[in-house]
A protein has these predicted regions:
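Active-site-proximal mixed secondary-structure blocks
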Residues: 1-32, 37-119
Length: 120
């Protein structure tokens, strides 16, 4: 017997990453994103999914670049904290004692404490 289900999310992407954005220190922000993945390998393209009502959305839309920062076990608290607190109310780099570093290609900062930073 066939079942029809309402549209929804059946597959939950993992792991969560910290996405850093902003083109200058006054707008730097970190958002925790679970919806991240590969679109294509040639040319290389990846995606993140961010709701329009999130604080980072207009920053991402304005600058059209960001960094996907992979996390580690030691960054679990910061990853969670950055996901439940808004950049409107907090300076996340400062409060989590994370270091914004200079990216090679984009203006958005990398997170120095992360082992792998993918500039997009």
């Amino acid at each position: 017997m066939k079942h029809d289900w309402k549209p929804g999310t059946m597959i939950y992407p993992l792991p969560a990453v910290m996405v850093s954005c902003g083109s200058e220190p006054s707008e730097y922000n970190i958002i925790t994103v679970a919806w991240v993945g590969t679109i294509c390998t040639n040319p290389p393209m990846c995606y993140i999914s961010v709701r329009p009502e999130r604080h980072s959305y207009p920053i991402l839309k304005k600058n059209m670049e960001f960094v996907i920062n992979l996390t580690t076990r030691s960054l679990a608290y910061a990853t969670d904290w950055c996901g439940v607190n808004s950049g409107k109310d907090h300076t996340k780099f400062e409060e989590m004692k994370l270091t914004p570093g200079k990216a090679s290609v984009v203006n958005a900062p990398i997170i120095e404490e992360c082992p792998l930073c993918i500039e997009c």
